[in-house]
Amino acid sequence: MDSITSAASVVAAGLAVGLAAIGPGIGQGTASGGAVEGIARQPEAEGKIRGTLLLSLAFMESLTIYGLVVALVLLFANPFAG
């Protein structure tokens, strides 16, 4: 693998993880804030809100994991290596 392809793969892997973490990070903060506000308004609905929050946080975190998988493929099983 030539040095340009190798360097571009490392940069792309870093961008994949970094950019894949921005959206879910913002979404998780917003969802958690909304859940805290909802529990503060209706404490009796805490169990239902918490369950829904945890499920949605898991779905959001899966987007970051997909970015990590793309980065690992670029680093260790590079399809552009030729």
Swiss-Prot record:
It comes from the Bacteria. One of its GO terms (cellular component) is proton-transporting ATP synthase complex. It is found in: Cellular thylakoid membrane. Its main location: membrane. The record marks E61 as: Reversibly protonated during proton transport. It is a multi-pass membrane protein. The keyword Acetylation does not apply. The keyword Transport applies. GO terms for molecular function: lipid binding; proton-transporting ATP synthase activity, rotational mechanism. Keywords: ATP synthesis, CF(0), Hydrogen ion transport, Ion transport, Lipid-binding, Membrane, Thylakoid, Transmembrane, Transmembrane helix, Transport. The chain crosses the membrane at residues 7-27, 57-77. Belongs to the ATPase C chain family. F-type ATPases have 2 components, F(1) - the catalytic core - and F(0) - the membrane proton channel. F(1) has five subunits: alpha(3), beta(3), gamma(1), delta(1), epsilon(1). F(0) has four main subunits: a(1), b(1), b'(1) and c(10-14). The alpha and beta chains form an alternating ring which encloses part of the gamma chain. F(1) is attached to F(0) by a central stalk formed by the gamma and epsilon chains, while a peripheral stalk is formed by the delta, b and b' chains. PANTHER family: ATP SYNTHASE LIPID-BINDING PROTEIN, MITOCHONDRIAL, ATPASE PROTEIN 9. F(1)F(0) ATP synthase produces ATP from ADP in the presence of a proton or sodium gradient. F-type ATPases consist of two structural domains, F(1) containing the extramembraneous catalytic core and F(0) containing the membrane proton channel, linked together by a central stalk and a peripheral stalk. During catalysis, ATP synthesis in the catalytic domain of F(1) is coupled via a rotary mechanism of the central stalk subunits to proton translocation. This is ATP synthase subunit c. It comes from Synechococcus sp. (strain RCC307). The gene is atpE.
